[in-house]
């Protein structure tokens, strides 16, 4: 459950990252995309929370304890301050690619119950699609 809690924490961070990103872009397509990704990550967090509780463990209730975002979402702060849509999109993509690695790492563990593995796989696949979809937005901002 500890690793799933870490995944939960990273989903909170990603959700905050997407919300912040949506507030710093003018392009309506990008704004909508970031908002939908934030909502998706909130849903993922709820699913992970329920899973942790089902193990009899206590889920964390917010993002990174220190208040600093996870390493992959840190660089987004500087991109946001520049209001550079291309830089923001790049950092979001980098964050999603790092999330993909985190999910793959957890899926390599054989000790996960099948139901947990199925949920994490579904979330991972959605993030993988997100990485591919984000590429569609590159032409909008470049």
Language model region names:
Residues 1-26, 87-111:
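Alpha-helical bundle segments that constitute or directly flank the non-heme di-iron/ferroxidase center
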Residues 18-25, 52-55, 80, 107-110, ...:
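Secondary-structure edge/capping motif, primarily at the C-terminal ends of alpha-helices
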Residues 50-100:
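Carboxylate-rich helix-loop segments that flank metal/cofactor sites and access channels
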């Amino acid at each position: 459950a500890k690793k799933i809690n870490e995944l939960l924490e990273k989903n909170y961070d990603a959700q905050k990252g997407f919300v912040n990103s949506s507030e710093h872009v003018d392009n309506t397509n990008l704004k909508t995309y970031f908002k939908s990704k934030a909502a998706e990550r909130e849903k993922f967090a709820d699913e992970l929370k329920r899973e942790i509780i089902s193990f009899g463990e206590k889920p964390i209730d917010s993002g990174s304890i220190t208040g600093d975002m996870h390493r992959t979402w840190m660089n987004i702060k500087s991109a946001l301050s520049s209001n550079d849509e291309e830089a923001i999109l790049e950092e979001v993509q980098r964050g999603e690619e790092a999330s993909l690695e985190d999910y793959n790492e957890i899926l390599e563990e054989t000790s996960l119950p099948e139901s947990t593995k199925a949920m994490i796989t579904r979330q991972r696949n959605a993030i993988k699609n997100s990485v591919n979809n984000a590429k569609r937005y590159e032409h909008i901002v470049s």
